[in-house]
Each structure stands twice: as structure tokens, then as C-alpha cells.
Amino acid sequence: MTEDKKVSVSMFIKELELEVVHKGENTDYEIISSDINRPALQFAGFFEHFAYDRVQVIGKGEHDYFGTLDRATRLRRLEKLFSYEIPVLVLARGLDFSSDTINMAKKYNRIIIRSQMSTTKFINKASGYLSEKLAPSKTVHGVLVDIYGIGVLLMGKSGVGKSETALELVKRGHRLVADDAVEIRRIEDDMLVGEAPDILKYLMEIRGVGILDIKNLYGVGAIRTNKVVEMVAELEYWEEGKYYDRLGIDEEYMTLLDVPVEKIVIPVKPGRNLAMIIEVAAKNYRQKNMGYNAAKIFNEKLLKKLSD
């Protein structure tokens, strides 16, 4: 299930350690976009297509330009600016707000804050923070493991052996990211990042044994806090008569948060070393990304042999 994310201005101020210049009592707004707006055009009097729902940042350029306007014009522009429900107005570089700006913020019950950082650094930091917090997300049932630098999401029905396979992978030197519940965020158009909920971080459940703390049992080298999800390995009980891919020519994909992720289906039956199979699958995935596809090369050789 996907979630619509919002960040309160109070949390934004706290996390980025910003100075509050004015914030009315019982006043808070929610930030819904990671994009930042610099209201230079608005200070010049152009309010068409004004992205008022974004964090508004004033740098030295806007600050100095605004100071060249006569007071009557400044008041009109401020009145117009604050008449929109902007979430917050930020002044970078430690610059000062004029008394007119503060009074107008009080009139419209808006929040104004200050950062000591340069404008560019503040925008980069604020945008990165908001992108992470506002990224589309969902929680899936599975186990996420870092195998040779490839984020592999193990999925399948409950009891099929996902956690046991992940434990064997950890013993083989790979790193656990999340067990049972994986929180996945789309931080870019085609990039998914998975992590464990705080309450489950570094923990694993093994039936018959109970809860294991992987960090304490195997050390910090056996865990990581998050990982890009690059491949899905779905474990399913072996079904006699069902076709399973034996060549690996046809690639299958699973869509997560509108992002296609390469998927392989691994049939589970006694005697199969699932950890080793998934380990090899991760190596093969990396090899294909480097331009070498063993299945396609074999197929080309076979077709050439048949045509001779």
C-alpha cells in the first residue's frame, strides 16, 4: 500500500536546525513538495504560475533586488506573496528580514525562518531532505539482502524459506537490510531504496528459533541500513509439470511503485541450495549489466550451429 507523504514545517525546522524568525501560536503548515522556489519573479510583480505550495527561499540576489524597490512597491509585493498559503519563507546566508516582511507575515499568519548556510547549500540540503521524506513508499513482505553489492529482494509465501535463505547468505558474507517487512521508497523516477522499519532493524525471525539480532550475532559487517532494490527473487514451492526457465533468455519484471524490477522465480524443493542459487543469480545479474549475457551467447551459438 502506497502512502501520501507530508512533512510539517516544525519538523523541517527541527531537522535542518533552522532559526525561527516568526511563527504564530498554534501555527504549522505541511510541505508536500520536495521542489524549492526562489520568488525572484514574484518580487518583480509576476505571480502567474507561482509555485506557492513549495518552500520559498530568498537568497542574496532576491534580498538585494527587493531592497532597491520603493517601500510602497515592497509592501504590495509582500502583501501579494503572503496572500498565498506558502508553507514557509526562508532567508539564506543569515540575512535579515525587514520589519515590513515580519509584520506582513504576522498579518497573514505565515512562518518565516532563517538559515546561516549559503543559498545553494541550503537548497541542496533542503531538497535532499524533502526528497527522502516525501518519496512515494510502500511496505512489502519479504527480505532484502545486499549480495555482492546487488540489492536482492526475496519474496514468496510465508514459510517458503525466505528468512532461512537470507540467514545462510549472511553466513556466506553478505549483508542483511530488512527481514519480514521491507519499506520501499522511490527516491528517483527509476530508483527504489529499501530499508527495515525502525522496530525491526537488524532483526530476523527464524521459525523454531525465534528472533535473532544479526548485528550482535555477526557484527556490523553483516548488516546495512538501506539498499537500492535491483532484483527480485521469488521463492515458490516446486510444482510438478510447471514450466521453469532453464535458459534465462526471457527476462521477467515485477513493478514496484511504478518501477520495473528484474525478477527471477526460484522453485523450492528439498536438496536445492537456495542461498548458493541466489548468490549466483546476483553475480549473473551484475555480469549482464556489464554487457555479458551467457544465455544469449549460448543461444546465438546454438542457432549458428543449427544453421550450419
Curated annotation (Swiss-Prot):
One MF term in the entry's GO annotations: protein serine/threonine kinase activity
Gene3D superfamilies linked: HprK N-terminal domain-like, P-loop containing nucleotide triphosphate hydrolases
Disulfide linkage: none
Cofactor: Mg(2+)
Assembly notes: Homohexamer.
Family: Belongs to the HPrK/P family.
Function noted in UniProt: Catalyzes the ATP- as well as the pyrophosphate-dependent phosphorylation of a specific serine residue in HPr, a phosphocarrier protein of the phosphoenolpyruvate-dependent sugar phosphotransferase system (PTS). HprK/P also catalyzes the pyrophosphate-producing, inorganic phosphate-dependent dephosphorylation (phosphorolysis) of seryl-phosphorylated HPr (P-Ser-HPr).
Protein name: HPr kinase/phosphorylase
Provenance organism: Peptoclostridium acidaminophilum
Origin organism lineage: Bacteria, Bacillati, Bacillota, Clostridia, Peptostreptococcales
Gene transcribed to yield this protein: hprK
